[in-house]
Amino acid sequence: AFGHVIFKEETLMVKAIVGANWGDEGKGKITDMFASEADIVVRFQGGANAGHTIINEHGRFALHLMPSGICYDNVTCVIGNGVALDINKFCSELEDVKKAGVNPKLLVSDRAQILMPYHILLDTYEEERLGKNAFGSTKSGIAPFFSDKYAKIGIQCNELFDDEMLKAKLHNIVTLKNLILEHVYHKPLLDEDELYNTCMEYKKKIAPYICDTHAFI
């Protein structure tokens, strides 16, 4: 389940839509309904394993990262720092809505952490290792992502703009992950330079949307 927060300026009103039934409660539909009268809609947590469908005059949109409210000209949509940001999926969804004639106002928190390719690999390998006891993961990398977030080894969007910090962090990450890949899963190891180049690609894609969303709100 994931949630949204909606802000309406003239009344200083905040509405929070939060799931309480393990997903599929219709949060996206309700958020989209409220968003028509909102100024800001915030997707504050969750990842691309969740989803919501919006149907309007622009078409049918199956969204996984974009906040509900993207189809309204009056709304600024914010992806908050609690979101597991899969940048490739973010860009793919953005391209799809733009093709339908929608140009959303989007901001991404500079403190949002990035779901990396190795998160998806580790998610997949763990399901393989568990065999018949597998959790039934969507293999979107969500569990490894949040493990890294709480272990304080995740990569924040703002760190893409600090080469020295990014390279030091990647060195630490690769050292830790390669131990797991080699000794637990017996899989190919990660390459620091390859991951750095991936991060530079992410930087180009996401840079226009990054800001201090806390200050904005």
Regions found by a protein language model. Give the residues of each.
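Short, Lys/Arg-enriched N-terminal segments with co-localized hydrophobic residues
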Residues: 1-12
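Non-transmembrane, aqueous-exposed alpha-helical and coiled segments at domain scale
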Residues: 12-217
